[in-house]
């Protein structure tokens, strides 16, 4: 590394340590408004992007080496972390598409046709600039750096005239805490450099400055707990820089979650959030049962729901008369004592001697998704029921037939009129009643949840170790996002990811082959018939996973040990299967036997099925 780079890194390290030592912000800096400071940071980021563009050009023509280019990228990323909390809050779609989205191909829809769009932004550059073949990709790196520079200028121009309210700033701060924990500390955000902890520190330091500016603005002169928590968080991040050994659980309980609650207390009273998100700003913990709004994902609204609607939905859920044969109900494949799965590799068909093509996933916390089924073919809970009703191997029925049956049942007629006084029995209300019951199947009171919220003093050390592995070295948390531990993407929690793992048809066979199920590619949605979705399946929750064996869409893995071994070798690629579009990293994780057992201990600590002895 050249001397000027070492010198600059020394200056940056000293500045960061000033934060870590809890030194107070100078009075003249306190007098700046948050907007003025944010504008300063945005301008700094734009300048850094210009410098990165010049460095990428120099790298392409051999004027600087890869280490110099990496240094410039890290500086640009550090600058972004100081404006990230606001820009990703105010402009989430633009930020995801152009500034810091995941380095994965995605589609844009033109009419009904899918167009595959390559990713751009800081994460893609992080992956490419730190790759062994960076020189071979120098032309593409330059193109991406040029695009990033242009995007930064565009957003800066729009941001100049944007006013900020205190509620927006506080929500942006709290959402950044979620982002730091779920995307930053997990390494999701830094796929090539692994510079996760330093970037988390930069983002946290900026939140601390903004907090003091807000306190000055509101004339809060008393020593607030938020200052102490920020100081402690920065010190901890500064003194614990090893990614694999970083104690994320201690950081969550000791600093981040208390800060999340404290900043809520400092938020303006009575202010109404304008966010289009399932995140509930009034929640006090990342692991509280009100962290997300389940009604965000359903056509049924909270004002329509109630005990009578839920009771009606429960009765319908367990009523076999909804199926044409009168022998199958929703509860046939989703059994309460097995966390609403059925324990079979693939569920039993209504046709004797046959099975359905896929495993029955749990319905506990299933509401927290914008897409349903393994292939994501349904967009709401209500649509999910519709697919089961029409499926010839399941209910093999139709709404008209079901409504006719129910209309001849006096108890059902009365129940619908009581639950839905304005319209009574109809197709829409039938779907809403079923959705109400499924929506009620929520569980956030596992031993781990209680410990994370500080409601219990201790938990098995193996569980702690497993959580830190899950969110760190094992990289589970980069696809199974906290706190749902599914593919519901933080911090807005409005859309689900699907992944291509290369799941084999029979993992224990000597000659293994890929499962033939095409997944999302064949979900009947024409605009998703793209190669990037071949054999792509929804990332389901690992909550209550101890009760839902066997695993994956085809139920081919019998135990959690089998599942972890599969991930440890790098998925289907680790079996030397031809998975040309695998999204799971193919590099082995190198987990020890103890680490594997720790992961299992953590996942078992997520067990919480209050409906196990349900009264039908």
Predicted segment positions?
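Short glycine/threonine-rich turn/loop motifs
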Residues: 282-387, 452-557, 562-565, 574-576, ...
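Mature extracytoplasmic or organellar-lumen-exposed domains after removal of signal/transit peptides
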Residues: 27-291
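Sec/Tat-exported extracytoplasmic proteins
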Residues: 49, 53-63, 73, 77-87, ...
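N-terminal secretory signal peptides that target proteins for export/translocation
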Residues: 1-5
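Extracellular low-complexity, Gly/Ser/Thr-rich intrinsically disordered linkers
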Residues: 544, 551, 556-610
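Amphipathic alpha-helical interaction segments
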Residues: 68-71, 75, 429-436, 598
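Post-cleavage N-terminal segment of exported redox proteins
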Residues: 9-29, 232-309, 396, 400, ...
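Extracytoplasmic redox metalloprotein regions
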Residues: 84, 97-163, 167-168, 315, ...
């Amino acid at each position: 590394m050249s001397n000027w780079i070492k010198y600059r890194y020394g200056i940056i390290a000293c500045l960061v340590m000033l934060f870590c030592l809890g030194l107070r912000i100078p009075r003249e800096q306190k007098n700046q408004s948050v907007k003025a400071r944010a504008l300063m940071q945005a301008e700094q980021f734009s300048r850094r992007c210009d410098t990165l563009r010049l460095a990428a050009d120099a790298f392409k023509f051999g004027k600087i080496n890869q280490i110099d280019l990496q240094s410039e990228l890290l500086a640009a990323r550090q600058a972004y972390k100081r404006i990230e909390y606001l820009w990703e809050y105010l402009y989430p779609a633009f930020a995801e598409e152009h500034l810091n989205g995941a380095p994965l191909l995605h589609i844009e829809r033109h009419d009904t046709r899918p167009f595959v769009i390559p990713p751009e932004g800081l994460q893609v550059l992080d992956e490419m600039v730190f790759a062994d073949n960076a020189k071979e990709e120098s032309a593409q790196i330059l193109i991406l750096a040029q695009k990033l520079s242009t995007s930064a200028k565009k957003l800066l121009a729009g941001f100049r005239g944007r006013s900020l309210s205190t509620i927006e700033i506080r929500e942006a701060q709290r959402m950044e805490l979620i982002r730091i924990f779920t995307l930053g500390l997990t390494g999701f955000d830094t796929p090539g450099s692994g510079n996760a902890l330093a970037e988390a520190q930069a983002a946290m330091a900026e939140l601390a400055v903004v907090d003091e500016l807000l306190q000055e603005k509101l004339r809060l002169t008393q020593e607030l707990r938020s200052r102490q928590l920020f100081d402690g968080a920065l010190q901890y991040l500064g003194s614990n820089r090893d990614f694999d050994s970083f104690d994320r659980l201690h950081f969550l309980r000791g600093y981040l979650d208390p800060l999340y609650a404290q900043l809520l207390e400092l938020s303006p009273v009575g202010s109404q959030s304008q966010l289009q998100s399932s995140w509930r700003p009034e929640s006090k913990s990342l692991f509280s049962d009100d962290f997300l709004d389940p009604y965000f994902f359903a056509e049924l609204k909270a004002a329509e729901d109630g005990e009578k609607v839920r009771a009606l939905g429960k009765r319908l859920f367990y009523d076999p008369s909804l199926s044409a044969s009168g022998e199958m109900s929703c509860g046939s494949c989703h059994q309460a004592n097995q966390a609403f799965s059925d324990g079979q590799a693939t569920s039993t068909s209504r046709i004797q001697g046959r099975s359905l093509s896929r495993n029955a996933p749990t319905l506990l916390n299933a509401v927290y998704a914008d897409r349903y089924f393994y292939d994501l073919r349904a967009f709401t809970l209500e649509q999910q029921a519709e697919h089961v009703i029409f499926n010839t191997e399941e209910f093999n029925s139709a709404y008209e037939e079901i409504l006719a049956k129910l209309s001849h049942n006096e108890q059902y007629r009365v129940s619908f009129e009581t639950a839905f006084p304005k319209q009574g029995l109809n197709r829409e209300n039938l779907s809403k009643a079923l959705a109400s019951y499924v929506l009620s199947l929520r569980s956030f009171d596992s031993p781990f949840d209680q410990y994370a919220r500080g409601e219990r003093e201790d938990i098995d050390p193996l569980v702690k170790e497993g959580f830190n592995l899950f969110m760190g070295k094992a990289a589970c948390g980069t696809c199974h996002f906290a706190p749902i531990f599914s593919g519901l993407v933080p911090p807005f929690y409005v859309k689900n990811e699907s992944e291509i793992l290369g799941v084999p048809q029979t993992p224990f066979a000597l000659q293994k082959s890929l499962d033939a199920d095409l997944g999302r590619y064949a979900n009947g949605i024409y605009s998703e018939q793209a190669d990037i979705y071949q054999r792509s399946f929804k990332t389901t929750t690992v909550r209550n996973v101890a009760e839902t064996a066997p695993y994956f869409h085809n139920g081919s893995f019998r135990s959690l040990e089998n599942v972890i071994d599969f991930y440890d070798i790098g998925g289907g690629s680790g079996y030397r299967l031809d998975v040309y579009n695998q999204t799971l990293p193919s590099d082995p994780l190198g987990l020890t036997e103890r680490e594997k057992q720790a992961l299992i201990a953590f996942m078992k600590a997520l067990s919480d099925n209050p409906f196990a002895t349900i009264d039908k």
